[in-house]
Amino acid sequence: MSVRILNWSNRRALAPIAVAIRSFKEQHPGADVAQVERPLSDFEHQGIEGVAAQYDIVIFDHPFCGRIAASGCFEPLETSLPDLLGDDRAALYIGPSLATYRYRTHVWGAPIDGATQNAAYRPDLLERVGGKVPRSHGDVLELGRRARHAGMWLGTALQTPHAFMSILSYMANMGQPVRADDDALLEIPRASFARAYQAMHDVMQLSPPEARGWNSIDLHEQMIARDDIVYTPAVYGYATYGEEDMRHRLGFAPFAGLEAPYHAGSTIGGTALGLSASASDRDMALAFIRHALQLGIVERRIGRHHGQAAARAEWDDQEIDRIFNGFQSGSYSSMETAWTRPRYPGYPEFQRKAGEAMASCLLAGADVAKAHGMLCDIAGLGVRAGAAR
């Protein structure tokens, strides 16, 4: 029997699992465990039922929990790993990392990676323009004007679904997020959407034209490769871009929202290990999931191998924070106050279409009414249903 793990292609994801596989094999001689990688774009829009039929363990993010529960393609984990994933185990993980995978009373994923939208910047360029790390959106615009005066830019990621993710973060920061239950999206508040859409437009206008094709990895890559992107206020953070082997080590800070507390409300990401209901060797797969979780919670080794664990123990580890140039300390407050996306079965498809629509609207200069109407149509809501109540 063998265990095949589906992962996504960045060293943040691959390196910690490779270490976990090696140490697992040392403890279980003869175990056949391997990982397969695929691009980030496939990860963000995966057909979860199909990959669950092909792999024993699938690394995924929480918006798929509704589809997973409805299809039965994964096995719930809370009864098999109660000491790591039980109702009283949330404090083992940063922010709502564990809660995001609890849907309809079951835990569908074991949190292995912790992330939310946070700010990132080039310390050398920030000093060059004479700016400070922004705390609020108003500060972001002031820094953006300084950057443009110096021939530099802010940065943003517009490729699906990242523009929409930033809009969701700004809305949640104002205390008026999109509203959903376990079955459907219920409301897209017009007032908070209008301000969030404008905030995203503001940042886009201060970003280079090429940003229209960037996802979160692209934005980090561009920030270390070129010398004219000073800062981004909202991107899914990659701690590895603060490591010493980068051409320019990035610095990290909390999400810069519209209202105080400015760091709060960013849209949580991260990933978890899901156990396929059709795993070829269930016991070995479950044993590997336990082993991988303990690598972060007990041994604190994920951050020492390019990863950013969901385990709180690693976020509190000063040496890991040093390795990543302050990533954990810089984004800690945003992780602790992050907002969780809806998880009803149809949400992943809504997110995909909404991401395409918001990127298109922003690039075309569409007004708030048109953009809001498009979102409500995609969600199957009338515009009145999407209005603030």
Describe the role of every protein-language-model region:
Residues P63-A69, A234-R249:
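A ligand-binding cleft/hinge motif common to bilobed small-molecule-binding domains
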Residues D182-G213:
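Glycine-centered hinge/linker elements that transmit conformational signals in sensory
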Residues G303-K353:
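Long, aromatic- and glycine/proline-rich binding clefts that accommodate carbohydrate-like moieties
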Residues S334-R389:
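Conserved C-terminal helix/tail region of periplasmic/extracytoplasmic solute-binding proteins
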